[in-house]
């Protein structure tokens, strides 16, 4: 998995880390190419020892309410029971796990994550509504201006109409956001098989009474570090320019 540069996401992410007084919101949106690199290939070989890539794995039912009757299982007497569980191929499951590893490294390792920690979401509209409700309840009026910008940027990057949407819902021991003071969190994967790309949207709210600046994550530290490097380069001369091949993994997004 390779992180793809996206200036729109970078601008949005700066607005997804905010202090509301009662809580601190820390969110980010990232785009990843599903093209496997060296470490990914090695991990994929180990992953396939437990089952072939095409084998289907059972996922947990989505953590949603108000599901349509078509997504509810029925007893022999015809009575509605719990929500139906979806399945995904082991290769897709690997992509989800690899995305988590890339996004949270080096602080967390998700290599042992299992299919029951993931869910396939019932619809795009439900996910959009869930995200909007969480962020609006946290930042109120400030989210009204950000909302169209956010979803337009995601759609341009991944073509939402073509995506399968998954979520990561671990137990407390495995949850990277399960620290004391955590009010809510979500982790959504927008997977476009045609583009071989995943957009990962992760966000959490931490109670202001338990929040410490270090919990803002590596994003803030990296931003501060980059500013320091820029200041040093201005005073100490220009350094070697970095080159990037991230754009080589991109293909044009054409929504049909």
Swiss-Prot record:
Biological processes per GO annotation: negative regulation of transcription by RNA polymerase I; negative regulation of transcription by RNA polymerase III
Signal peptide: none
Record-listed Phosphothreonine modification sites: 64, 212
Region (Disordered): 58-85, 212-252
One Pfam match: Maf1
Keywords: Cytoplasm, Isopeptide bond, Nucleus, Phosphoprotein, Repressor, Transcription, Transcription regulation, Ubl conjugation
Biased composition (Polar residues): 61-76
Outcome, altering residue 35 to R: No interaction with RNA pol III and impaired recruitment to tRNA gene promoters
Acidic residues compositional bias, start-end: 218-231
GO cellular component, one term: plasma membrane
Molecular-function annotations in GO: GABA receptor binding; RNA polymerase III core binding; RNA polymerase III type 1 promoter sequence-specific DNA binding; RNA polymerase III type 2 promoter sequence-specific DNA binding; RNA polymerase III type 3 promoter sequence-specific DNA binding
Effect of residue 64 to A: Much stronger repressive effect on RNA polymerase III transcription and loss of phosphorylation
Record cross-link Glycyl lysine isopeptide (Lys-Gly) (interchain with G-Cter in SUMO1 and SUMO2), residues: 35
Post-translational modification: Phosphorylated at Ser-60, Ser-68 and Ser-75; the major sites of phosphorylation. Nuclear accumulation correlates with a concomitant dephosphorylation. Phosphorylation may attenuate its RNA polymerase III-repressive function. Sumoylated with SUMO1 and SUMO2, mainly on Lys-35. Desumoylated by SENP1. SUMOylation promotes the ability of MAF1 to repress transcription and suppress colony formation.
Residues that bear Phosphoserine: 60, 65, 68, 70, 75, 214
Record localization: Nucleus; Cytoplasm
Subunit structure: Interacts with TFIIIB subunits BRF1 and BRF2. Interacts with Pol III subunit POLR3F. Interacts with TFIIIC subunit GTF3C1.
The family this protein is said to belong to: Belongs to the MAF1 family.
Role noted for this protein: Plays a role in the repression of RNA polymerase III-mediated transcription in response to changing nutritional, environmental and cellular stress conditions to balance the production of highly abundant tRNAs, 5S rRNA, and other small non-coding RNAs with cell growth and maintenance. Also plays a key role in cell fate determination by promoting mesorderm induction and adipocyte differentiation. Mechanistically, associates with the RNA polymerase III clamp and thereby impairs its recruitment to the complex made of the promoter DNA, TBP and the initiation factor TFIIIB.
Name the record gives this protein: Repressor of RNA polymerase III transcription MAF1 homolog
């Amino acid at each position: 998995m390779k992180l793809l540069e996206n200036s729109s996401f970078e601008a949005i992410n700066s607005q997804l880390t905010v202090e509301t007084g009662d809580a601190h919101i820390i969110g980010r949106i990232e785009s990843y190419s599903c093209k496997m690199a060296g470490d990914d290939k090695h991990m994929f070989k180990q992953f396939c020892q437990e089952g072939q890539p095409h084998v289907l794995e059972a996922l947990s039912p989505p953590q949603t309410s108000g599901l349509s009757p078509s997504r509810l299982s029925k007893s022999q007497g015809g009575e509605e029971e719990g929500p139906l569980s979806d399945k995904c191929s082991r290769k897709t499951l690997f992509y989800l796990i690899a995305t988590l590893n890339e996004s949270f490294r080096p602080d967390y390792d998700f290599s042992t994550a299992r299919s029951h920690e993931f869910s396939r979401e019932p619809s795009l509209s439900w996910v959009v509504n869930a995200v909007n409700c969480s962020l609006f309840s946290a930042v109120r009026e400030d989210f009204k201006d950000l909302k169209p910008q956010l979803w337009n940027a995601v759609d341009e990057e991944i073509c939402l109409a073509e995506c399968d949407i998954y979520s990561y819902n671990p137990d407390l021991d495995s949850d990277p956001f399960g620290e004391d003071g955590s009010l809510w969190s979500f982790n959504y994967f927008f997977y476009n098989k045609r583009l071989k790309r995943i957009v990962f949207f992760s966000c959490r709210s931490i109670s202001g009474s338990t929040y410490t600046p270090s919990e803002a994550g590596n994003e803030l530290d990296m931003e501060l570090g980059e500013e320091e490097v820029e200041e040093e380069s201005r005073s100490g001369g220009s350094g070697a320019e970095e080159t990037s091949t991230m754009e080589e993994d991109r293909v044009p997004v054409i929504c049909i």
